[in-house]
Amino acid sequence: PLQYAAIRSSHPAFSWIVPGETGGTRQTAYRVIVADNHEDAASGRGNLWDSGVVGSDQSVAVRYAGEALKPGKSYFWRVKTVTNTEGESEWSEVKAFRTADRLSEYETAYYPQVKTMEFPAGITEIHPGTRLVDFGKDAFGQLVLTLASDGTRDSVIVHLGECLEGGRILRDPGKSTIRYHRYPLALLKGTHTYRIKIGKDKRNTGSAAVLMPAYVGEVVPFRYCEIEGYEAPLSPASVVRETVHYPFDETASSFRSSNELLNQIWDLCKYSVRATSFLGVYVDGDRERIPYEADALINQLCHYGVDREYAIARRSHEYLLQHPTWPTEWILQALSIAWYDYLYTGDSRSLESSYELLKPRVLMALREKNGLISTTTGLQTDDFLRSIRMKGQIRDIVDWPHTGILGLGKKQGGEDDGFAFTDYNAVTNAWHYEALKLMEGIAGALGKQDDATFYASESDAFKKRFIRSFFNARKGYFTDGLASDTDHASLHGNMFPLAFDLVPAGKKQNVVDFIQTRGMACSVYGSQFLMDALYEANDAEYALHMLTKTDDRSWYNMIRVGSTISLEAWDNKYKPNQDWNHAWGAAPANIIPRRLMGVEPLTPGFATARIKPQLASLEWAEATIPTIRGAIRMEVENKVDTYVPVSYTHLRAHETSAHL
């Protein structure tokens, strides 16, 4: 059946990029029309809705105000604008959209997955009758072969895998979940095209997993294909990988700098976003295919950094509100995902729809008498768990994996820097503070002023309480728990407070100094917040060092071991059961545009933006950074004793605050 991006709301919202090439162009008015037939729309008649000329600079999330749309119908819309430099525009092209078979007042629309035909980057004969096909990059897909047989050979063996060992596909990945599959293929006489039937894996098709849609079929991740027992000529056109992914615009973003290693890391992480989008929602990789909030948060920011695409993140977020996962901090991260969605799109409909689900995820119900939250003091009542849609207890995670699990030896350290878990956890409480701040912003955006005032008061009081509880004034940094419980200090117990503005006045450098003593003592997940913390503290040089270092706890190590998608962990030895296709390891895809190049929205929908490049020792950098209002293109030179201003062209109807 035909697949299309169905509009699922009876009152959708419209966005457009304001035309005009003159510097300083701003929209001053707009007019939107919606018709139920192409003829009316083409003639400038909105027989369902005509907004009239609206004096406004709003060009994102303009809500349809006509009669409710009907399910299963096609509609047509167009817009014209007035700007301060070019006056009234012509009508835009007529754009069509079709509604879903079932509509509600609000439901997120999304694109269907697509297939891209990809041909080999190279074919090598290993020995007579066996060829190794390399597609150049790992991807989730299906294999289509066109093979010939004279009838004397009735079958071949097809091997698919992600990794090579000794010039052959790795057949025994050990404890890891690096993928390998073997498929016998019976040949018919003559030349025929065969589609390899991918079988379901019990590990990633269970009740908690997101399943591939029937119109696509099952997929596996593979870069390499070996065809064994085939002696006829094999051309690149006869070996096709149909790669499955969410629609992706390769031209929407770019980055290059004077550091070639950093450029390679950007390429790895940008590609990882496309490659891991195969399910149409963000998941944790191929091993489980389950959405988790932490994966979704990092993936969301990375996707915003590499493509002008927002629906997949919103769909993933709304799925997780109904299907939350067990870590305490990840329940709290629902607030971050919701806020970033609003900040990057300017569309508050998801916030409105989800508001009552977001409030309990601040975890006020877990507040103890001392004002801190705890998951271990008996406060996880049935009512509380129902309020956050959880079927079991939640537990603090800090980072993952912990010591002695998932293939690690009993005494082999995990990724939490030896964090001392106690009843009152500095990391969990830092996330609680962040959630309070975000809930204040969400309530304010929705006009719920009493709630906004409440959360503002709570966050102000909680910041003081957090510092009193966890900051060791004598040492100048935070401990993992209360002084009565532990004096252990970890990277995590300090990087999260630094990232969330919880460090006491005048003590930021002390905390940064401590963080630098810990190195990359966190997982690829934790690295997102380490990088955020360092750039928040304006420690760009150390941040650049961490981005570009080359030991086995680095993004470069992912390239060195042979992966073309970001790994689940820094190396197999740090998580022996890891995937080689995990977008939560792709943090540079958002850290580079958001932090190094310094482009972030200050107000919802990029109505105002901050451009604050922190190049450190890079000689130069240039980037194209997507936003919902259009692309920001930047060129920055970094010369000693020479003032070289940022050169950038940016979207219209937009204000920018530049920092040098």
Residue ranges and their predicted role:
Residues Y224, P233-R315, T325, E329-L332, ...:
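Active-site acid/base region of carbohydrate-active enzymes
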Residues T325, F514-A521, D552:
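Solenoid-like repeat scaffolds
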Residues Q412-T422, G481, V512-R518, Q528-M531, ...:
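Short beta-alpha connecting loops at secondary-structure transitions
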Residues M520-T550:
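Repeat-solenoid scaffold signature
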